[in-house]
């Protein structure tokens, strides 16, 4: 589907109504979260190097606060004008994750997976390629979206076998994320 969307002419990609993108605008209305000492140490390690390519593995038990740590890293990326991609292993995790994201940031991230409508795909494609949409949450296929200035890719639950595509073009989304970064 991504390839088909990419081949649509520019006229079809233009958004007729700008309000379709408004819900993705970065907002200042967000909750303030205090990091625990352990989370703060992990965040400092993630933030040590401000430029260049690097890969980190943030490991912790369920409920240990890993999500808040990488939300903080995404926040830093957004503050310098870059975009972020959060990969989830399964579509079923999207709704709950969207709520966490909106609660933390105060705005919606674009959600990309096989069940997204063609109209919404067009809006997201245009918004990411123009830089208007700053964050996308998605399944494996979101790796192929046209980000204008991608600054961070987070692979949530990177050990999950769902990241491995065994049909059609065979690839591992975790490995592709490293290559794309």
Question: Where in this protein do the model-derived segments appear?
Answer:
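Accessory, non-ATPase domains that flank or precede helicase/AAA+ motor cores in DNA-metabolism machines
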Residues: 1-181
